[in-house]
């Protein structure tokens, strides 16, 4: 018999049985092909509150579950099921949570110590790619698989980044990202312009 859970009740979602390298809580957020559908299903306010609570809990352990404890904490950045999690807020009315948590992961998860750098799943350069893209303020939820890719905006760590574009795929020669007042603590975007046109909030 299969009985749907009442998601308003307290469910022990960190149990691993039935899940490979993750938990029910973590896999709940892994719907990269239909994030808006997931938000509608959960409800935006609950979506934001639950995800924020998961990040706050996992920040205490630097978003890192070592060894075989992949499902022990809500957000385990070193595993595929959670690498997109910080950018899920970009699909809500409060995208600044993306900027906060993506920057927190860069500051706390990555580093030079034995628990830092690549303690997680570095398949095909995944960890380093996430860091590089996030540090220039970009991310793709679908991992570059879409015919018409959508780039999500994070918080650049550099005041200027210049990317040479391959004319086989792009009409322009380069993409230049400029950010004002860049600092370690200043991670919140106030406005964005693309080709001198102001973009909407999300």
Question: Which residues does each predicted region cover?
Answer:
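Conserved short-loop catalytic and cofactor-binding motifs
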Residues: 1, 23, 73, 120
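Single conserved hydrophobic/aromatic residue that forms the stacking wall/gate
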Residues: 1-11
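Short, flexible, glycine/charge-rich loop motifs used to bind or transfer phosphoryl groups or to couple energy/partner
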Residues: 1-3, 28, 182
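Extended ligand-binding clefts on enzyme/binding-domain cores
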Residues: 9-42, 75-76
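Non-catalytic C-terminal accessory modules of carbohydrate-active enzymes
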Residues: 10, 41, 45, 52-63, ...
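Flexible glycine/proline-enriched surface loops and loop-helix/loop-strand junctions
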Residues: 12-21, 32, 65-70, 81-82, ...
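N-terminal hydrophobic targeting segments
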Residues: 33, 47-50
């Amino acid at each position: 018999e299969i009985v749907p859970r009442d998601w308003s009740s307290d469910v022990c979602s960190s149990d691993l049985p039935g899940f490979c390298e993750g938990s029910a809580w973590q896999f709940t957020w892994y719907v990269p092909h239909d994030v808006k559908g997931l938000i509608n299903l959960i409800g935006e306010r609950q979506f934001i509150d639950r995800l924020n609570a998961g990040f706050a809990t996992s920040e205490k352990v630097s978003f890192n579950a070592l060894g075989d404890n992949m499902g022990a904490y809500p957000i385990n950045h070193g595993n595929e099921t959670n690498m997109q999690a910080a950018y899920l807020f970009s699909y809500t009315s409060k995208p600044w949570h993306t900027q906060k948590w993506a920057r927190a992961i860069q500051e706390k998860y990555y580093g030079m110590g034995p628990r830092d750098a690549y303690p997680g799943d570095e398949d095909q350069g995944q960890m380093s790619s996430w860091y590089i893209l996030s540090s220039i303020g970009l991310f793709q939820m679908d991992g570059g698989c879409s015919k018409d890719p959508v780039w999500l905006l994070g918080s650049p760590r550099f005041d200027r980044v210049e990317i040479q574009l391959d004319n086989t795929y792009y009409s322009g020669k380069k993409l230049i990202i400029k950010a004002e007042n860049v600092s370690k603590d200043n991670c919140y975007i106030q406005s964005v312009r693309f080709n001198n046109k102001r973009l909407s909030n999300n």
